[in-house]
Amino acid sequence: AFFYNRGTCEYLHDAGRSGVPAKGLEMNQEVIIVRGNHTLKGDVRVSGAKNSALKLMAASILGQGETILHNVPLISDIELMSEVLARLGATVVREGHTLRINTADVDSCETPYELVSKMRASISVLGPLIGRFGEARVAMPGGCQIGARKIDMHLVGLEALGVAFDVDHGVLAATTPNGLRGTHVYLEFPSVGATENMLMAAVTAEGHTAIENAACEPEIEDLANMLNAMGARVS
């Protein structure tokens, strides 16, 4: 619990240990009391957002050369996504907080289960793999079946673009029998992941695609900006 008041800041451990809890507190509840009236100043370096970085890394699959991402956070999920891309055939080089991703030699559309199962965001490679190859084999996070996790909206949106799916032992196999075609899709919920996968597949589809009730989080805007920089038209 956090109590905000004027003055100094103090941390109370086991506020109710005396036998009489403070007003509004339960016995043995830890409390931070913050008392202000001091000017806040200084500088802080803000790390890049993981949710944006992972999806921009996935979007690099759509390119045929080098993608450079700056201000990438140094966290384990970024390393895992780098490994996923490398297994697909990409070259990933880290220089501090900068990633250089060359996808010219990506020649596989199947992600390794042992990596994908460790990271929920790995489902985001589905859309760009379909966009580049017209097919994909992506192990679902945790090997779950459809419906066990919130990926159904991803599939509904991609199916509207012309993708056909089959599931075998936790592996999602996607094909495009008649190619990708532009469409109009209404998402029952503004799912961030579904919006991202649809965007990355739709930019290679024939015709225009409209996504109604799409998510509009900052990472969606970052992804749209990158796709536009790669030659797409997203608005």
Where would I find each of the regions flagged by the language model?
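Extreme N-terminal basic, low-complexity initiation segments
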Residues: F2-R6
